[in-house]
Amino acid sequence: MAKQVEKLVKLQIPAGKATPAPPVGPALGQAGVNIMGFTKEFNARTADQAGMIIPVVISVYDDKSFTFITKTPPAAVLLKKAAGVQKGSGEPNKTKVASVTKAQIKEIAELKMPDLNAASVETAMSMIEGTAKSMGFTVTD
């Protein structure tokens, strides 16, 4: 008989820096997962993406084993890195904090394509542009 998925745990963890401390430990402890096993495997798999926040979806099975899928970093994190700022604007429609180019938007859209619900790069670019505008960034050619 196939293993049944008992629980899905979604987290955003800095690449290569998963530790048993919160938020990882409590979330996985409640599901009965081997926390050290997860942290070692996650850190090994994401070591090349240092400095990024990596979303991860952990499938916990009824025998307490697990598998996980790492996704691409959130668009907001990629935009902040591209613009070289720490955080977006508190009032995005009034105060603009940075600007990003269409080329940077296209690069981010191509990177995020596997995780976005978009049929083409152009559609993905408009999604990323919307995120940029809601963060108080201006989009330039």
Swiss-Prot record:
Q: Name one GO molecular function term.
A: large ribosomal subunit rRNA binding
Q: Which GO terms describe its biological process?
A: translation
Pfam families associated with the record: Ribosomal_L11 (PF00298), Ribosomal_L11_N (PF03946)
SMART domains in the record, alphabetically? RL11
Give UniProt keywords alphabetically. Methylation, Ribonucleoprotein, Ribosomal protein, RNA-binding, rRNA-binding
Q: For this protein, what post-translational modification is recorded in UniProt?
A: One or more lysine residues are methylated.
What PANTHER family does the record tag this protein with?
60S RIBOSOMAL PROTEIN L12 (PTHR11661), LARGE RIBOSOMAL SUBUNIT PROTEIN UL11M (PTHR11661:SF1)
Subunit details for this protein? Part of the ribosomal stalk of the 50S ribosomal subunit. Interacts with L10 and the large rRNA to form the base of the stalk. L10 forms an elongated spine to which L12 dimers bind in a sequential fashion forming a multimeric L10(L12)X complex.
Protein role: Forms part of the ribosomal stalk which helps the ribosome interact with GTP-bound translation factors.
Output the HAMAP family linked to this UniProt entry.
Ribosomal_uL11
Q: What is the protein's name according to its record?
A: Large ribosomal subunit protein uL11
Q: Which organism is it from?
A: Lactococcus lactis subsp. cremoris (strain MG1363)
Q: Tell me the classification of the organism that encodes this protein.
A: Bacteria, Bacillati, Bacillota, Bacilli, Lactobacillales
